[in-house]
């Protein structure tokens, strides 16, 4: 029973830890596209530079998900 509880806890922790990354990839493109400023790609590029010091560019794909180059 304890093994099942530990396994379930690790699975749940893994899902919680993985979720913010997807949300963050979408949020930079969506927030950059507010008020028709067309700054989504710039926000994505800045997000890539902050998160990955070695990646200095990025763009938003057709699903508004940030793709770091």
Curated annotation (Swiss-Prot):
Family to which this protein belongs: Belongs to the invertebrate defensin family.
Signal sequence segment: 1-18
Protein name: Fungal defensin oryzeasin
Subcellular location field: Secreted; Target cell membrane
GO terms for biological process, alphabetical: defense response to bacterium; humoral immune response
InterPro entries noted in UniProt: Scorpion_toxin-like_sf (IPR036574)
Disulfide bonds: 29-60, 44-66, 48-68
Cited function: Shows antibacterial activity against numerous Gram-positive bacteria. It selectively inhibits peptidoglycan biosynthesis through complex formation with the cell wall precursor lipid II (1:1 molar ratio) thus inhibiting cell wall synthesis.
GO cellular component: extracellular region; membrane; other organism cell membrane
Transcription in keyword set: no
Propeptide feature ranges: 19-26
Keywords in alphabetical order: Antibiotic, Antimicrobial, Cleavage on pair of basic residues, Defensin, Disulfide bond, Immunity, Innate immunity, Lipid-binding, Membrane, Secreted, Signal, Target cell membrane, Target membrane
Organism: Aspergillus oryzae (strain ATCC 42149 / RIB 40)
Gene Ontology molecular-function annotations: lipid binding
Gene3D superfamilies tied to this protein: Knottin, scorpion toxin-like (3.30.30.10)
């Amino acid at each position: 029973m304890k093994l099942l509880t530990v396994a379930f806890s690790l699975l749940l922790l893994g899902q919680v830890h993985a979720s913010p990354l997807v949300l963050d990839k979408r949020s930079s493109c969506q927030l950059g596209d507010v008020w028709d400023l067309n700054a989504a790609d710039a926000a994505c590029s800045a997000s890539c530079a902050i998160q990955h010091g070695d990646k200095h560019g990025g763009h938003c794909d057709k699903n508004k998900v940030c793709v770091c180059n």
